[in-house]
Each structure stands twice: as C-alpha cells, then as structure tokens.
C-alpha cells in the first residue's frame, strides 16, 4: 500500500468524522477572524498560549459545527486547551 493510499484513507476517515476540509476551514477562519478583531478593537494583548488556545478552540468548534457534534473528543480537547491556560494563570506564571 502506497503512502498516497494511506493518506487518502486517512483523509476519508477524517471527512466522515469532521465534514469537508473546505467547510471546516471556512467556519474556523470566520471564528478566528472575529476573535482576533475583537481583541484588537479592545486593545487586548493576549499571551502566546492564550492566542494559541483560542485558535485551537476555534478549530475544535469548527469541527463540531461542520462534523459530528457528538464526538466527545472535540469537547474534551476544548476543555483541555482552556485548562492549560487557566493552570498557567493560576500558578502566576508568565507565558513563555
């Protein structure tokens, strides 16, 4: 089995779970644009981990909206990204 076949099989599996890549990309980019515009309009300077967590949360929300909303892993990942930032803030640590 070739690498191309393996990749195509993987992509087909992902599409059945998350919907089309194009649909996901559209939703994800709209969410990210709104978040980044809102932060900029309010002069919010977020730390790199906060920005990345928000981007990853937007990615997971897009997967939920474009694909299977009952796939628990997406919801768990959202909680995980938020928890990573919250733990760093609660410890009083500065972002790297």
Predicted regions and their residues:
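Intrinsically disordered, low-complexity regulatory regions
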Residues: 1-96
């Amino acid at each position: 089995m070739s690498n191309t076949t393996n990749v195509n099989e993987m992509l087909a599996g992902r599409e059945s779970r998350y919907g089309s890549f194009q649909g996901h990309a559209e939703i994800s980019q709209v969410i990210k644009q709104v978040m980044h515009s809102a932060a900029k309009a309010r002069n919010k300077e977020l730390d790199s981990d906060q920005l990345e967590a928000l981007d990853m949360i937007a990615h997971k929300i897009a997967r939920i909206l474009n694909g299977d909303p009952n796939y628990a892993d997406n919801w768990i990942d959202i909680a995980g990204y938020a928890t990573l930032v919250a733990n760093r803030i609660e410890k009083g640590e500065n972002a790297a």
